[in-house]
């Protein structure tokens, strides 16, 4: 194997191949799940894991004392199904992690970094589990094996050579456990930096910011049980059939109890039309259950306009008939109502409706419904958060709920539906670039050092710092940072500017191939795998989307004897850096998870008797908003807010594009090449467009085009996309990420939250 020549690792491709894989189109189905979902899920499991391992993992998936799914953060019901408490994409996530495929030192000897970078993200991910710690030394073309101790020593040396701790960046993926994330945050603070960007910066940061400003807590207020008591559930900017399939059970139960479901989405998603529950007879041999009573195919990012229209109409009906707005709740628990009414008065209903692209007749039934009902849940995901005005979108949802008095009541409240399985837990246990004097004091009290007080860097700003040479070491606790971030080429250059990049990973991904001068892959245990120390079994804990903390216990043998758990990896790095400083017992923290949890309980409220309470069903963390308590806010009341209509400043010929996932995808992990629920098969390089727009542009279905964005005079291009006619509002486009991420500038992000504008990118279509 040739390891050193003129072919440096910097020639690695940031973007995969732009060839096509053979598009096949069908009419989108009118339902989700059912027998096809079971069949496809089991085929995937058998192909990746085989029979024995499939039984061992799936029988324990999301069960009490079992494996927490590494996919989404949707909560588990108190009473688990004996037929299996998982969904199609949960099975895919487990199969992806527990695959029998292996990426060994021989694999790395065979393939250079350059060659692997020319593969698709799908092919890279399907290579398998990394079995040994690997290093790409400066100037080398191939990764080579490295002993764990040497890897830790290299990281420690690079950190010691920094001019100051803020030249280091510690990124966290939502797959990491509470225990690992806590130690990671402790290490960064002890080192002296708050540079702790995490994946939530790119997704639900807008949710946390909007909710914290208005309600005093950055988490949702509802529980899973609330769905059975809700009069109305609004699902906005979210596609549960692909991203949170078990949520469909909750929506079905809501309707069975007499509740109504209102879906608001630019695309008609099959799962929001009809759901065939494969655990019920009618889901196997019948027609299943309708999910949405009303479906509004709104224009991209016009949710504020819709909500303002609804609130204007509710105020009108209140003035005419009364008993629509909860004045008792408003007087006792809020302020800012007068300013809200004044803001709404400056808009006409006609202009608001025009912005949405909807018709009055489509929206008025929802107005009537909300006027008559009190208990309202609003659910949302990236369709609301990934915009310049993402925080405004969330605050406007809160405005509607406050008008109805539907926060802190059974069957009503906020429901940001989180993506990665422990993204909320990581934040709870201290992964944040923000500075909290209270949190710093707790760390100082527990570990006897003064944490840094300088605000850290979030994702977009850490990329900028690396690009400008102001950050030298980048470490990722899980994730595929390059493919997840916006502005792919810019992000790639940023990573390549680093002296050292470190990835704690289970599987190969593109971030391992576009690296700093030196790069390390540190292979770790997955959720499915047994975690033991000195013969004693250990478990980790996670927090779901609704604030419940519970344990996850691995059940199968590790993919390799050379793997190390995340807490141990973090503690060993810390020990390597701090050497003779024994003020923090890193060894014990990395190996004794009970001890680590005891320290978490000393730093954070709500974790008393952590280890014992996390067993069985787990425990709920304190949530004052859930109780209708807003005392954490100034004045002790919730806040109405004033939010402007978005201005996308589209020029002639420009469209507003949103990046989306396919059904064979979770975050940056590509399970396959199909998007079954949209009738798109064996292809990812597609752009969904309204047939009228195709006609106006004199294009044809299946024609190949390029997509181009232009921000501040800088053009970015994504090449080779196939035109697919689709039911989407005129002027709007949709395309998959990470393929379309190259079009999103790193400096275009949400006000306050700094979340990239991945759901509202100005683009134009360029004919070939």
Regions found by a protein language model. Give the residues of each.
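Intrinsically disordered, low-structural-confidence terminal and linker regions
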Residues: 1-66
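Acidic/polar N-terminal loop/beta-strand segments that form early-domain functional surfaces
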Residues: 133, 171-173, 658-660
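Long, low-complexity segments enriched in small/aliphatic residues
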Residues: 588-677
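Long, structured ligand/cofactor-binding scaffold of large enzymes
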Residues: 143-146, 150-229
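Cofactor-/ligand-binding subdomain signature composed of acidic, glycine-rich
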Residues: 43-50, 58-166, 266-373
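Short boundary motifs at domain starts and secondary-structure transition points
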Residues: 159-162, 367-368, 465-466, 645-649
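Non-catalytic alpha/beta scaffold blocks inside enzyme catalytic domains
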Residues: 206-399, 403-409, 416-599, 653-656, ...
